[in-house]
From Swiss-Prot:
Its main location: secreted. The keyword Magnesium does not apply. The lineage of its organism: Eukaryota, Metazoa, Ecdysozoa, Arthropoda, Chelicerata. GO terms for molecular function: sodium channel regulator activity; toxin activity. Disulfide bonds join C4-C18, C11-C24, C17-C32, C26-C30. It holds the Pfam family D_CNTX. This is U5-ctenitoxin-Co1a. InterPro entries: CNTX. The presence of a 'disulfide through disulfide knot' structurally defines this protein as a knottin.
Amino acid sequence: TATCAGQDKPCQKHCDCCGPKGECVCEGPCICRQG
C-alpha cells in the first residue's frame, strides 16, 4: 500500500496511486505512485 503526501494513513489495499492533492486514487490518471 502507498501513503500519499499529507496523509496519515496508507491508502486502501487496492488504492495505491496518489492524486494531485495527495489523495488516494483507485482509478484514472495518477500523478505518482509511492510504495
